[in-house]
């Protein structure tokens, strides 16, 4: 199973532009990998080699994204797939997953309803590594 990357040739998402979705991804990556600056995150960046992320970081990023789009995903009973976790290498892989999830959500929603990321939900989340600390 590989990533489709349909968004590279045809952007079908109506609720968010490429730049808006990429900004959401960058915000999530820099929240989990807090030593990074937003301008360091590119589509081609390798999460493990360039940013020293591990599998817990990747899972955390997907959980943050799921939380940011929770209202729409719960309404449509759409979930972020976990079957591709082991294949996520690049930042664009995360974007690809979310693009496909958001397309699925849009296909199940009223066409006049826009999906909006909830940045407040992200702010309320603790960093994954802090969940089990005593701080």
Where would I find each of the regions flagged by the language model?
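Phosphopantetheine-dependent thiolation modules in NRPS/PKS and related acyl-activating systems
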Residues: 2-53, 57-63, 67, 71-135
